Structures are given as structure tokens and as C-alpha cells.
Amino acid sequence: MIYRIVHRTTYKYKFPVSVGTHVACLKPRTLPNLQSSRSELRIQPRPATRTERVDFFGNLLCFFTVREPHKELVVEARSEVTIAASATPQQPIPLPWEEAVRAVPNDHSPAGLEAYQFGFESPRIRLRPEFAEYALESFTPRRPLPEALRHLTTRIYKDFRFDPKVTNVRTPPEEVFKKRRGVCQDFAHLQIACLRSINLAARYVSGYLRTYPPPGQARLVGADASHAWVSVYCPGTGWLDFDPTNNLIPSDGHVTLAWGRDYGDVSPLRGLILGGGSHTLKVAVDMEPLDAEPSRPGQPAS
């Protein structure tokens, strides 16, 4: 599939901002199944300084500073990407999950060393006995890792309700686990917490999810969504992606922007401002297919 993606973020401030320094993580990664033919970032007001670099995890970041007084900041990322159906070029090896746990600390290959760092607590994800207990209902003795991961993904999808009104970006997995409600970020954090609590390596993936209008209705510009899902390291195979919000294995409708230990590593836009007072935030995402699009039932949540 080929997509044109427009991600527009608008901050409106009650009072003028005299100086704002920001970091944008809005350019798609290049992967074996994902290529970007065009990617640009439009910023208003025009930044006084602007630099780009790759972070520790390989994500593409843009650092910029706006020094003129402003009551509105608009950051618009435009990308054109080509994505194949699967990031995994082979069938996952049916490795028992316990063997995967033992293999990662002893894997000194570049892939193994990279995976090892995703097995620990991170600023937004703590390891808890209750998470391990929940995970072990799926990770029964000697069960193949891919099968257990699929089962856990389905359980989270069934046991938790999508509800954008009960959480925010700072809600910890412990609270989500109690309330049994949340959004994609919450369910990704929760699944990662469960997996790390049983010593598996799992990372947080941010990106875009294509949505589909109801039958007979036109596609609405700006109605697509930023999204989050989970990637788990399977020794001998590589990274396997799972979307607990929609009970899906990500395919050509999921476009990866970035990955890290948790949301804090891959926030689309963050920074510091001087002034401004209160503010409002509006985000619109448009993911337009540029080639023939198949008909798909259902409306995924994000």
C-alpha cells in the first residue's frame, strides 16, 4: 500500500508565548517493509533554529526553537510511504516462551543486545506481580511464544474497554489494570508491563492506523488516527508486532513512526515554553491511500 500521511498539530495559547523549544518525532522510520519517498515538517511560526538527528533508538527527531511571540503553534508533518503487509519475512519460530526468556540475556548479537534493554522497567512502566499473574494465564508451560503473545493480545482486547474519557498520557498501567478501560497508549503500556514482568523483551511502537468509513460513506479528511502497539522480541525470528487495542497483528494499515521503552521516548511533540498560560490542543491525521484500496469491514479503535 502507498499512503500520503498528513499529521497536523495545533496549539492555541491564552497569552503570547515568547520562546518555545520543541522536539518533534513525526517522520516515519525506514524498515524492510516500510519506505518513505517523501517526508517534510512544516512549522508556523517559522523557527529561529532547527536541527535534525537520530536518537538512541534510531528514531528521526527534529529540534526547533521559536523565538518570536506567538499565540498559536502549528506543526504539520507530511509523508508519503510504501508499506508491505508484514515486517516479518518468515513464519515465526514456535519457540517455547521460557526458552525465549533464557535466550535473550545470552544473545550477544546486535539484535539480541538491542532487545535486552527492553526487558526492564522504564519511566512509565513498572513491573508488578499482578501483571505477571495476568500474563501467565496465556503463557502456560512450554507454549510457543507467538501463540502465547496472540492469546494475551486477544485477552486484553476482550477484558478491557476502549474509553478515551478515563485516562490521559500520564495514566500508569496499574490504574488501567484496575479500571479495565483506556486507549491505545494504555493498552500498549499494559501489555508491555505484562510481558516484561515475565522477563520478555517488549517495546512501545508509535505510528498511524488507517481507519475505514462505514459502508456507503465518504472517507473524512483528518479522521484517521495516531496509534500505539507492541513489538516483542522472538529469538531466531526477530520482532513481532501486536495491536491489543484492535486484536490485530499489524499489517499494511499500520505505519510505524518510532519505537522506544514507553510513550515518553516517542511522544510526537514535546517541549518547553515561556509564557502562554492555558492552551488548547487539536490533532488531525489524514492517511490517504494512493493505490487501489481493498474493502475491509469494521472500524479500528485508536
PLM segments and residue spans:
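Structural beta-strand/beta-sheet cores of well-ordered domains, especially the beta-sheet scaffolds
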Residues: 1, 7, 20-22, 39, ...
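Secondary-structure boundary elements
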Residues: 99-182, 263, 278, 285-293
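Glycine-rich, flexible loop/turn motifs
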Residues: 93, 158, 168, 172-173, ...
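Helix-biased "structured C-terminal domain" signature
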Residues: 250, 266, 274-302
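Short beta-strand segments enriched in hydrophobic/aromatic residues
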Residues: 13, 81, 234, 287-289
